[in-house]
Amino acid sequence: DFEVQRAIISCPVSHGSGSTKSHVRSAYAHLSNEDGSHLSSVGRALVAERYEGRYGVAYRLDGLDTTNSNLRSRCVVLHGWEHTTSYPIWPRATVGSFGCPVLSRRRMAEVDELLMNESGVVIDIFI
């Protein structure tokens, strides 16, 4: 919420398949903004169109930073998946995505409730 300068929701996500290493430093070597990399891109993203996809409700993302400017062309979207947990499991790795920030199904339902009637929502994707 920009008016009170605080996050409305914060939750763990599964990242791209190359970004799940056993310690944080190595994860930064496995980020990419390149098409076909199947790696995560960090930075701020505008939450765009809602749609029903392969994994249920999903939202297209438009990258706002140079580190994630290709999110839309890479088809990186925000979605839920049953193999992602609602709680941090670090230092163990989660099952990776092809670059999408993936929430647990439960958390995605909560996020969807917040996003359904909003516009101009920005998320911050980080490791």
Regions found by a protein language model. Name each.
Residues D1-F98, R105-V122, I127:
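Cell wall/extracellular polymer interaction/catalysis modules
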